[in-house]
Amino acid sequence: MIKIINVNPNGVIEYSATEQADIANLPKNVESTSTCQLITAAGLTVYMFQKTGDKTGNWIAI
């Protein structure tokens, strides 16, 4: 499972992928050291991932 470990004031959610399957299901350029935002709209939850320290502003939705 993806465990939420911290929610910082700007809304970024830090997570830990605790099972290998979770890591395998993430896009190849996303690591377990990434930050994650949960965006819920119209009943759907979208996980937005960004590598820690990535200043490009590029988020990957899964």
Q: In which residue ranges do the predicted regions lie?
A:
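Extracellular/surface-exposed low-complexity repeats and stalk/linker segments enriched in Gly/Pro
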Residues: 1-42
